[in-house]
C-alpha cells in the first residue's frame, strides 16, 4: 500500500487502471521515463500497442505540451455504460473532492468545451471550512489535524445540528464506512469519554 504507484491506482480498495482498462473501448497511456516518452495502448482490455517510444502528448489530447508526467486517455465502453452512467455533476464532484485530498494539485474538467478547474492549498482543512460555510456555521475551536505517511485525519466541532463523517482510502471514498472510518470514530468517542463530565453520558450513536 505504501508504494507510490499502488497509492495512485487505489490498490485493492478500488478498480484502478486495471478495471478501467477492462471496461473501456480503448485506453492509451503516455508516460515520461528518464526524459523519454513511451506509449502503450489497449482496446477492449486487450493489448494493441506494445510499449514503444513516442513523443510528448500535445494538442491531440487538448492538454497542451507536456514536459513530464503521465497521461491516461480512455473511452468507457458504451456496451457496458450508458451516457446516463456519467452525469457531469458526478465528474465535477469527483474532481473537486480529489483537489481537497491532494492539496497543491490542480484538476481540470472539460465538459462540452467548458472547463472548470479545482485547486486546494489547505486540503481537508479547506473542505471542512467549505462544509461549515454551506451550513452557515463556524467551528467552535481550532481544527484538529493529524497526518503521517499512512493517514490524515481532520476533525472540527461546530454548533450545527447532526454530523458529517467521510472516509477515504487512497483517494477513494469509503461510502459504506468500514474499518478505516469506524476506527477513527471509535477513537474520537473514546477521547470524548475521558473528558466528559461526571453527569454526562455519550454513546457511539450520539
Regions found by a protein language model. Name each.
Residues 4-7, 78-87, 175, 198-202:
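Short, polar/flexible loop-turn hinges at active-site or ligand-entry regions and domain interfaces
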Residues 8-12, 19, 83-87, 119, ...:
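Catalytic cores of large soluble enzymes that bind and process phosphate-bearing ligands
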Residues 39, 83-86, 165:
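Short, charged, solvent-exposed linker or helix-capping segments at domain edges/interfaces
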Residues 53-60, 89-92, 96-99, 104-206:
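GHKL/Histidine-kinase-like ATPase module
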Residues 1-75, 81:
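GHKL (Bergerat-fold) ATPase N-terminal catalytic module, capturing the glycine-rich phosphate-binding loop
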Residues 23-24, 31-33, 74-76, 111, ...:
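Flexible glycine-/small-residue-rich
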Amino acid at each position: 500500500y505504501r508504494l507510490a504507484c499502488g497509492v495512485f491506482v487505489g490498490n485493492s480498495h478500488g478498480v484502478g487502471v486495471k478495471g478501467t482498462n477492462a471496461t473501456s473501448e480503448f485506453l492509451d497511456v503516455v508516460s515520461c521515463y528518464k526524459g523519454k516518452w513511451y506509449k502503450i495502448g489497449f482496446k477492449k482490455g486487450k493489448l494493441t500497442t506494445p510499449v514503444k517510444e513516442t513523443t510528448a502528448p500535445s494538442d491531440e489530447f487538448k492538454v497542451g505540451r507536456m514536459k513530464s508526467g503521465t497521461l491516461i486517455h480512455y473511452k468507457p465502453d458504451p456496451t457496458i455504460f450508458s451516457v446516463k452512467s456519467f452525469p457531469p455533476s458526478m465528474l465535477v464532484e469527483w474532481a473537486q473532492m480529489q483537489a481537497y485530498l491532494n492539496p497543491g494539485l490542480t484538476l481540470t474538467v472539460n465538459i462540452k468545451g467548458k472547463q472548470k478547474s479545482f485547486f486546494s492549498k489547505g486540503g481537508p482543512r479547506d473542505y471542512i471550512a467549505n462544509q461549515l460555510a454551506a451550513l452557515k456555521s463556524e467551528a467552535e475551536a481550532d481544527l484538529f489535524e493529524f497526518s503521517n505517511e499512512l493517514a490524515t485525519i481532520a476533525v472540527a466541532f461546530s454548533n450545527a445540528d447532526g454530523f458529517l463523517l467521510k472516509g477515504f482510502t487512497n483517494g477513494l471514498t469509503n461510502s459504506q464506512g468500514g474499518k478505516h472510518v469506524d476506527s477513527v470514530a471509535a477513537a474520537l468517542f473514546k477521547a470524548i469519554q475521558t473528558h466528559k463530565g461526571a453527569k454526562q453520558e455519550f454513546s457511539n450513536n450520539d
